[in-house]
A protein has these predicted regions:
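Short, T/G/N/S-enriched strand-turn elements that build extracellular solenoid repeat scaffolds
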Residues: 23, 33-34, 50-55, 69-75, ...
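A generic structural micro-environment signature
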Residues: 7-9, 30, 99, 118, ...
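N-terminal Skp1-binding subsegment of the F-box domain
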Residues: 1-30
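Concave beta-strand-loop units of leucine-rich repeat
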Residues: 44-49, 62-69, 82-89, 101-108, ...
């Protein structure tokens, strides 16, 4: 599939008509595009085994729907990535990434890039891996099941912890917003 150079957005949604749906049923796909956002939430995507988004174009934001759980190659210039509920694959994140949101089933070892400033785990996240937070992280949100020891970044300004968090932590002096058990402190 080759997307025209003047494409601004690539959208494949469950509710699109069959004639408008992008045929993503082949085993391997490459997206060569000039769009800056990609949103994929189509049941046909589950047939893809590998998805490559070529980095020489200007894709800055990618959102995958809840059914997406395939291997992906991300562009080097990506800044925002949202992975849906069922995504649980090993993934290499680009050094340009600033915003990252994981869905509820993600539970893989991961190396976070130093460029990351916003990290969110879905409210129902079942993430149980050790994690090293980047030094530049300013916003961190964990879901209600997160309950593991963690060392917070000295640059952290916003922290949200769910009802299941019962660890002692040292809060950095930079912290200006703390939400714990959904109540602002």
């Amino acid at each position: 599939m080759i997307i025209p150079n003047d494409t601004i957005y690539l959208i494949s949604d469950y509710n699109c008509s069959v004639k408008d749906a992008i045929n993503l049923s082949l085993l391997n796909k490459e997206i060569y595009d000039n769009c800056n956002r990609i949103y994929l939430n189509n049941p046909l995507i589950t047939h893809i085994k590998n998805l490559h988004i070529i980095s020489k174009y200007n894709v800055k934001k990618i959102t995958f729907g809840d059914d997406f759980n395939q291997l992906i190659t991300l562009p080097n210039n990506l800044t925002h990535l949202t992975l849906g509920a069922r995504f649980d694959q090993l993934i290499t994140l680009p050094n340009s990434l600033t915003h990252l949101t994981f869905g509820e089933y993600f539970n893989q070892p991961i190396t976070l890039p130093n460029s990351l400033i916003h990290l969110t785990f879905n409210e129902e996240s079942q993430f149980y891996q050790p994690i090293d937070l980047p030094n530049n992280l300013t916003h961190l949100t964990f879901g209600c099941y997160f309950d593991h020891p963690i060392t917070l970044s000295n640059s952290l300004t916003h922290l949200t912890l769910g009802v299941g968090f019962h660890q002692s932590i040292t809060l950095p002096n930079s912290l200006t917003h703390l939400i714990f058990n959904k109540d602002s402190v």
